[in-house]
Amino acid sequence: AIVYLPPSYFKDPSAQLPVIVLMSGQPGTPQDWLVLGKLPQTMDQFAAQHDGRAPIIAVVDVYGSQTANPLCSDTSHGKVATYVQKDVPSWLRANLPVSSDPGQWAIAGLSSGGTCALQVVTRAPDLYRSFLDMSGEAHPQLGNEERTIADGFDGSRQLYEANDPVHLMSHNRYEESAGIISWGESDTAFKEGLIEIDHVAEKSGMRIETRTYPGGHSWKVWSAAFEDGLPWLAQRFGL
């Protein structure tokens, strides 16, 4: 994982700050957000506009390798849900001055990382209240649903549904949760699923915005979407 600390942290290391947990797609690594996503430049520019204050960013690896996709879940392939919902928050609270208010915690990701962000928000709404889903899928998947359940969820439909955000939003209420769903205008392969998420999320009580950007399934879209989402998150955080 990689952690970004805003300038205000170095002036007052005890002042509590909001948190964004950020994920790449697959294949991808946390470093991609630094190089391809221009995260340091984006955050420094944001901090300069807010008297040095900005969220703490933890860019985490939810895959473990360049080829694996454990579907952001606790299965025989790994304990990714535990990592993102327990281990990462516990480390941040123990080592950095992060806010204890779930309203100041957000999770964000691109492609399968965007899917993961929505999975986490729907599984743990009392931990992360805000999210950015950039070009994510509607469901965790390794091809079709049958293969996904067989290979990704140990053959258990119950386990699949417990980690499928569309299923969870169809059966639960999320009035305290809010997010932005975004995609590239020419990203036709992902657009349909994101529109499905929008409809189901609004019915669950979530406050949802949809935003589109010129481009396809690319860093051009994701870096713009993240930068564009920061003011919205800052408002949610009360920065």
Give a label for each model feature.
Residues A1-L239:
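Non-catalytic cap/lid and distal C-terminal segments of serine-dependent acyl enzymes
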